[in-house]
Swiss-Prot record:
Protein name: NAD(P)H-quinone oxidoreductase subunit H, chloroplastic
Keyword Transport included in the entry's annotation: yes
Gene Ontology molecular function: NAD binding; oxidoreductase activity, acting on NAD(P)H, quinone or similar compound as acceptor; quinone binding
Organism ancestry: Eukaryota, Viridiplantae, Streptophyta, Embryophyta, Tracheophyta
Summary of subunit composition and partner proteins: NDH is composed of at least 16 different subunits, 5 of which are encoded in the nucleus.
Source organism superkingdom: Eukaryota
Similarity comment text for this entry: Belongs to the complex I 49 kDa subunit family.
Gene Ontology cellular-component terms listed: chloroplast thylakoid membrane
Length: 393
């Protein structure tokens, strides 16, 4: 970090890595001239665990529990990107029912991630009351996850060729009830937060990013859409069954922290629309493509054969990753989550490069906070929405 040469006395302040507003183990070395930010240097790597190297020494089904530790608040998306790559390499068809259930889980995970962004974001800028309301709705989403997958977090629900299990009895009605309830709560958020004059003073005109600047920095997700660029991979790539549903891309023109807040708030309403359509049009059929499982078993095993005794046990998939290169991506809550995958005719990937949206979006932070006040760092960092698990990997 270059220290500016001026006649004034500058103060260097360490924010983090143990700071409640850093959203993880992020450290910022901030140079201050009074209350004005002169320079800011993010220090990363406190949560680095070598996730890419671990992937090169695991079969895909073995690696699935690891990927939920990237963005641990939106684990369905990390699971989706992990199974989408091998499915495309192996030309594996996902049953329509499984695809619809995947969409439902992805959008519920998007809502949970946005809720867990909104609550601490409001607390960062001094509004404690909405935090408790928001976490109440988040618990309902986690109850749905627990009923369907058995886990509130780290679900391990996606499988190559489908999902781990079908939806339990009564889950669809419970989810539809939540959708109706949540739409009324979003209206309450708008009354409580959006029109609050103190909130508007803290976020309006703070951390402005232009559309061209956002593209040049490689930003994605709400960061890009809040700068006037209506770019959403669910519309662009049409992965899973998103092209079968009616919904709109949410975007704003202002490019400030308020615009990023509005994009995420409106996205939750669009997610509810997608979930309702998927639940009402949920097709029948299998929830998993069993051909994706590489069985190597005799057609007529003998009665006392060791293999025959354990025929009811599901073996792990043993298919090979073909020798090709592939880049797959999904629209995660924080932006474009991508994987560059290289296979080499073995069960393990030769290269597994992760493109985390939080890491890319965080790079613009030093530019945004310069010439701003110290208190605005919390607002700007909160509006970016980062999780250090995926930033450091």
């Amino acid at each position: 970090m270059k220290r500016p040469v001026t006649g004034k006395d500058l103060m260097i302040v360490n924010m983090g890595p143990h700071h409640p507003s850093m959203h993880g183990v992020l450290r910022l070395i901030v140079t201050l001239d009074g209350e004005d930010v002169v320079d800011c240097e993010p220090i990363l790597g406190y949560l680095h665990r070598g996730m890419e190297k671990i992937a090169e020494n695991r079969a895909i089904i073995q690696y699935l529990p690891y990927v939920t530790r990237w963005d641990y608040l939106a684990t369905m998306f990390t699971e989706a990107i992990t199974v989408n790559g091998p499915e495309q390499l192996g030309n594996i068809q996902v049953p329509k029912r499984a695809s619809y259930i995947r969409v439902i889980m992805l959008e519920l995970s998007r809502i949970a991630s946005h809720l867990l962004w909104l609550g601490p974001f409001m607390a960062d800028i001094g509004a404690q009351t909405p935090f408790f309301y928001i976490f109440r709705e988040r618990e309902f989403v986690y109850d749905l996850f627990e009923a369907a997958t058995g886990m509130r977090m780290m679900h391990n629900f996606f499988r190559i060729g489908g999902i781990a299990a079908d939806l339990p009895y009564g889950w669809i009605d419970k989810c539809l009830d939540f959708c109706d309830y949540f739409l009324t709560e979003v209206v309450e958020y708008q009354k409580l937060i959006t029109r609050n004059p103190i909130f508007l003073e803290r976020v309006e005109g703070v951390g402005i990013i232009g559309g061209e600047e956002a593209i040049n920095w490689g930003l994605s997700g709400p960061m890009l859409r809040a700068s006037g660029i209506p770019w959403d991979l669910r519309k662009v790539d049409r992965y899973e069954s998103y092209d079968e549903f009616e919904w709109d891309i949410q975007w704003q023109k202002q490019g400030d922290s308020l615009a990023r807040y509005l994009v995420r708030l409106n996205e939750m309403t669009e997610s509810i629309k997608i979930i309702q359509q998927a639940l009402e049009g949920l097709p029948g059929g299998p929830y998993e493509n069993l051909e994706s499982r590489g069985f190597d078993r005799k057609r007529n095993p003998e009665w006392n054969d060791f293999e025959y005794r354990f025929i009811s046990k599901k073996p792990s998939p043993t298919f090979e990753l073909s020798k090709q290169e592939l880049y797959v991506r999904v629209e995660a809550p924080k932006g474009e989550l991508g994987i560059f995958l290289i296979g080499d005719q073995s069960g393990f990937p030769w290269r597994w490069k992760i493109r985390p949206p939080g890491f890319i979006n965080l790079q613009i932070l030093p530019e945004l906070v310069k010439r701003m006040k110290l208190a605005d760092i919390m607002t700007i960092l909160g509006s970016i929405d980062i999780i250090m698990g995926e930033v450091d990997r």
